[in-house]
Amino acid sequence: MSTESEARIQRIATLPFEKAGAPEGGLVSGIAPAVRDIWGHRALLDLLIRRELKARYKDSALGFVWSFIRPLTMLAIYYFAVGQVLGAARSVPQFAIYVFAGLTLWGLYNEVIAGGTTSILANAGLIKKVYVPRELFPLASLGSALFNFAVQFVVLLAAVVVLGQFPLSWNLLYVPVAVVLTVIYGLALGLFLSAVNVYLRDVQYLVEVALLILFWASPIVYSFGMVVDRAAARGQEWIVTLYQLNPMTDIILAFQKGIWRAGSETTTMADGTVVPPQPFPVDLDFRLLVLAVVGLALLLVAQRVFARLQGNFAQEI
């Protein structure tokens, strides 16, 4: 064995061992070491986010402009197909703002979960070669999703200002609350599903179907008032209760209440129809508080499950 090889072996022997996947502590106490580990690799997290954003638009002539094109295309489709053809816009004032607000927040939620679910498998080469906190990969998907959300939110704000609908009221505080809750639930599910997807590859396809169902089960292209009215007309108020079991229902409603001023006012439509304020849940604040507590608990559990499962990632992928 050469002198150079011996020196290299001796140098490696002096390096400390890094634990990969061995969860330290219990349900709560194990969180602190994980957070410290992630914080110690924050520079790498920044690089992963930048890499993901660059890879998404690599060799594209328009680049980041596609961040605008896709949501604007979806807005146009839903505005004309659902709003004008199916008539949903007749009972929803400023329908374009209403739809785009829902699409913007849902886009964040969808991207965090979908990107997080496949993040471990997408970085299989790196995981096999070096040790890094595996949580960095779902977090990088979150960072990329937040960037795209910020771009779309700027467009939404511009539209609100141009149409003279900027909500100068305390309702504006619902916007950051809704965004934070979306991040909490998206990250919790993204962490959990990214770990499970390593062992059960069908999970990523089930997630696509589930997100599609949840999209139509959320007040995005139709109003919450429509659900309330239809349920009341049939004497089936339990439908509203069932509808609100989807956490994104109340979160999207909070976001709409903050950014969609017309929904909180009595509005006269172009045909003379007077539309009353939208029936936001009277206990929305309390429901958001409950969602915050439940979401943090889910995030805690998701991280511990992730820590349990990550030990065999390198072998499984």
What are the residue ranges of the model-derived segments?
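Hydrophobic transmembrane alpha-helices and immediately adjacent juxtamembrane helices
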Residues: 1-317
